[in-house]
Design a protein with these regions (language model features):
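Catalytic glycan-binding domains that act on GlcNAc-containing polysaccharides
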Residues: 67-224
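N-terminal secretory targeting signals
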Residues: 1-90, 96-97, 220-224
Length: 224
């Protein structure tokens, strides 16, 4: 398959603080677990992996920063593009999330958490489409929860052990984006493999292809 490379987090104090030197701690994770190169798991059956202390700390810092999703912009043009993005995505999402207030809050949070982790917001929206069909309280057969179908064990590994918080919009999106960013760094930017790892089906085409296809529904067409 072709190698798909996702963007790195942009420069800025906020991103430097919680995601410092991702390649270094991603390598530490690869060395810390023997499961990385083992047999492919079935979809939805991903296993908890041992994390190096540096990886655990980086992810914990990413999750526990409780500031609200209030974006800042370099200039008025960037802010205008953001507003256009919100309008476009809101129109596309209306059928799935008919309540305007809920839809706006969801999109603002998804945009913020995606950018915070250096991800394309459209990719995150496509992943959510595949994972939960935008159902806040979705629970999979293996117990994954919420919009981004986060496995509860992550709350023990990098959170505060509050599994019910995975049904909180911002908490769920923050976990999901941080975990996907970690997998991207583990896979040296290979989005295809990172998506497979997110789903517990690394190396199998069904899930990555589904997300990449859904991503097309959320591509931003900037008029600026």
């Amino acid at each position: 398959v072709d190698t798909l490379t996702a963007p790195r987090p942009a420069n800025g104090a906020d991103r430097r603080r919680w995601w410092a030197r991702p390649q270094r701690w991603a390598m530490a994770l690869a060395l810390a677990t023997g499961a990385l190169h083992g047999p492919n798991a079935h979809a939805g059956s991903q296993k908890e992996e041992a994390l190096a202390d540096s990886v655990r700390l980086a992810l914990s810092n990413a999750i526990l920063d409780a500031r609200p999703p209030k974006p800042t912009f370099r200039n008025p043009a960037d802010q205008q593009r953001y507003q256009v993005w919100l309008a476009q995505m809101s129109a596309r999402l209306q059928r799935r999330l008919p309540d305007q207030q809920v839809r706006t809050e969801f999109l603002e949070t998804a945009w913020y958490e995606a950018h915070r982790a250096g991800l394309d917001p459209g990719l995150v929206l496509g992943l959510i489409q595949v994972e939960s069909a935008y159902r806040k309280y979705a629970v999979s057969m293996v117990g994954a929860r919420g919009y981004m179908q986060v496995m509860p064990f992550w709350t023990n590994v990098i959170g505060d052990r509050n599994r019910s918080a995975l049904f909180n919009m911002q908490t769920n999106l923050r976990y999901g984006c941080a975990i996907l960013r970690m997998y991207l760094d583990m896979e040296a930017g290979n989005l295809y493999l990172a998506l497979g790892r997110y789903n517990g089906s690394r190396g199998r085409p069904e899930y990555p292809n589904a997300v990449l296809s859904a991503w097309q529904n959320w591509k931003f067409k900037s008029p600026l």
